[in-house]
């Protein structure tokens, strides 16, 4: 027999409906704010987003201070005047209830988790919730607006029922005085909270300016601009928000010189000749230039702004000559960039002129070096760079004293290319060394990788992130990797390097007693039971370990018991073990073990939910 609801729950449901659909002529809401703490908290936890929004927005000012968190740290008995009070905790719960995928474990999110916890007082969960909701509304409306038969106003597009229901609203013709079924209504009601927005080309219009008039956009992402009509609409949107926009991105766009000129004029702040954009990105787009080897002078002026901190031209079809021109412009302008991303552009040879100038003119070289002193991140992924490019790059790197991240993934630099960079590590070990290096899929062999690892170990180089993934290094690399684990390395990606069971056995033998790793990816190495036994040892030695990726390693069924036994004796902070793709492991057969680990505060373990039907992993090329 189903348990009858309590009187408290029945009252909470009644109040929820009143908050959603009532007009409060009788002042009932005032009585809600006077409820005892226990009853108010019970109500708060049962309210959907729209009701919570109404309850919070109508709260009298004199009552607001009563809903902050109390300081339970023991250092003082006072109330903490912080934003993560009872309402914010409720918003946070609603946010992750609706978008659980945003709480997934990933390397990037776990890297910043500690910082986020320390700065949680800066996070406005109500703003995050409605910003994401409005984005969902625009995405849903775009599907309708892109239909050939569409001819009405964008703001009048009716949103899917699932979106309306997600905020707690249900159609009640007789007792509701507001229609939440159109895009226009959601923008008017919640547009105020939007700081970041992604727009498809169907929204590049004057009407969109009316829809987002209340928003104070700091980040604007524009997709699929391809016509003059789109250009005109984009310029109107930019003009409306130019005083607030800091991050501007174009994706899958065709960018003409005339648009660049119009954009620059639109974004210029009154009384100056400059814009205030801090982050400018062009992704998977194309510049429509009469001369493919050139770029619009206005664009070069735009990227030379002293306010610009990040420049990303990823998969923008710029080519070697344009890359040279961009780099030369940044140097001549003494740009204060912290991030330069030229990935996926096929720019082999882009630094050849720079190297020649450096070699021949010492004084010019010293002047040039001043222009690169602020660069912290350099992304050259997927640019078809070769050994000769690494020779040129080494000269440039020598004049980037604060560079922290270098991404060379997906470039066929081979062993000789890595050897060209080794002198750079020797020269920088004592001052401002590189901390993040990505050499994923660089066609390295055992010789090149071992040479690099040996140098880093000998120098005690303070590197925190290294990826050697997708390089055919073989099991012989294991001793060098084991020695490398003695260093300060925190994030190691050695996915699909051909370790095999022999490699994992050697890695286990050479692993130090104390390992500093926070993240490791050993997936796709066909390690079998030896991979599980390596993890058993690693878990006991790496007290700071948060994430382990060990999928597709052909682990036998007994591997899960080996790993779980290590968790019983753990003293660390492990949060995730990913064993997906090991088809002989089955979560349903070990449900009790996995449940016990979770009950004891253990990590999340990702395994196959059911036995695989002979779907063996095949890593043949």
Regions of interest found by a model, annotated:
Residues 197, 220-223, 248-250, 278-282, ...:
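Conserved hydrophobic beta-strand positions in leucine-rich repeat
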Residues 187, 210-211, 234-238, 270, ...:
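C-terminal per-repeat helix/turn "cap" of leucine-rich repeat
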Residues 388, 439, 445-450, 459, ...:
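C-terminal capping region of solenoid repeat domains
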Residues 174-181, 201-207, 226-233, 254-262, ...:
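Short, solvent-exposed loop/turn at the beta-strand->alpha-helix junction
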Residues 214, 242, 274, 305, ...:
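Leucine-rich repeat
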Residues 1-208, 215-218, 226:
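Cullin-RING E3 adaptor/co-adaptor recruitment helices
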Residues 251, 255-415, 420-429, 435-436, ...:
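Solenoidal tandem-repeat scaffolds enriched in leucines and small polar residues
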């Amino acid at each position: 027999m189903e348990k009858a609801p309590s009187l408290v729950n029945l009252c909470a449901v009644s109040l929820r409906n009143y908050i959603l659909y009532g007009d409060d002529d009788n002042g009932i809401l005032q009585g809600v704010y006077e409820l005892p703490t226990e009853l108010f908290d019970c109500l708060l936890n049962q309210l959907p987003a729209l009701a919570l929004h109404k309850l919070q927005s109508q709260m009298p000012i004199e009552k607001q201070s009563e809903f902050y968190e109390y300081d339970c740290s023991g250092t003082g008995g006072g109330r903490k005047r912080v934003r993560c009070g009872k309402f914010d905790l409720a918003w946070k719960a609603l946010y992750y209830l609706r978008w659980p995928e945003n709480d997934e474990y990933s390397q990037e999110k776990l890297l910043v988790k500690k910082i986020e916890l320390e700065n949680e007082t800066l996070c406005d969960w109500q703003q995050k919730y409605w910003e994401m909701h409005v984005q969902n509304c625009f995405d849903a409306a775009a599907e309708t607006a892109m239909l050939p038969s569409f001819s009405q106003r964008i703001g009048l597009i009716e949103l899917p029922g699932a979106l309306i229901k997600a905020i707690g609203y249900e159609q009640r013709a007789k007792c509701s005085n507001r229609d939440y079924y159109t895009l226009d209504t959601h923008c008017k009601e919640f547009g105020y909270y939007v700081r970041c927005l992604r727009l498809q080309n169907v929204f590049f219009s004057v009407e969109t300016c009316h829809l987002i008039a209340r928003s104070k956009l700091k980040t604007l992402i524009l997709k699929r601009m391809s016509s003059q009509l789109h250009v005109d609409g984009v310029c109107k949107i930019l003009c409306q928000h130019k005083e607030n926009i800091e991050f501007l991105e174009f994706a899958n766009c065709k960018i003409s010189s005339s648009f660049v000129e119009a954009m620059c004029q639109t974004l210029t702040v009154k009384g100056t000749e400059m814009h205030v954009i801090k982050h400018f990105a062009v992704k998977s787009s194309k510049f429509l230039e009469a001369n493919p080897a050139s770029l619009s002078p206005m664009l070069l002026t735009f990227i030379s702004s002293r306010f610009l901190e990040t420049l990303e031209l990823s998969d923008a079809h710029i080519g070697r000559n344009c890359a040279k021109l961009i780099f030369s412009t940044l140097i001549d302008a003494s740009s204060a960039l912290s991030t330069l991303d030229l990935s996926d552009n096929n720019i082999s040879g882009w630094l050849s002129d720079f190297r020649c100038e450096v070699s021949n003119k010492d004084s010019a070289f010293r002047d040039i070096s001043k222009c690169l002193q602020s660069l912290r991140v350099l992304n050259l992924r997927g640019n078809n760079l070769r050994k000769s490019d690494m020779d040129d790059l080494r000269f440039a790197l020598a004049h980037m004293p604060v560079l922290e991240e270098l991404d060379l993934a997906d470039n066929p630099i081979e062993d000789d290319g890595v050897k060209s960079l080794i002198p750079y590590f020797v020269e920088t070990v004592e001052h401002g060394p590189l901390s993040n290096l990505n050499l994923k899929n660089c066609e390295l062999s055992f010789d090149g990788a071992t040479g690099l690892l040996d140098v880093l170990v000998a120098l005690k180089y303070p590197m925190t992130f290294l990826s050697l993934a997708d390089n055919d290094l073989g099991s012989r690399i294991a001793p060098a990797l084991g020695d490398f684990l003695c260093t300060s390395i925190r994030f190691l990606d050695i996915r699909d390097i051909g370790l095999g069971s022999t490699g994992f056995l050697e890695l286990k033998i050479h692993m130090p007693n104390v390992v500093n790793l926070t993240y490791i990816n050993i997936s796709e190495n066909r390690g079998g039971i030896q991979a599980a036994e390596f993890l058993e040892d690693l878990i006991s030695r790496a007290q700071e370990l948060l994430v382990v990726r060990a999928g597709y390693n052909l682990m036998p069924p007994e591997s899960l018991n080996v790993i779980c036994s290590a968790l019983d004796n753990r003293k660390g902070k492990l949060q995730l073990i990913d064993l997906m793709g090991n088809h002989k492991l089955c979560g349903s057969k070990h449900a009790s073990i996995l449940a016990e680990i979770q009950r004891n505060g253990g990590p999340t373990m990702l395994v196959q939910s059911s036995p695989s039907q002979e779907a063996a992993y095949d890593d043949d090329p």
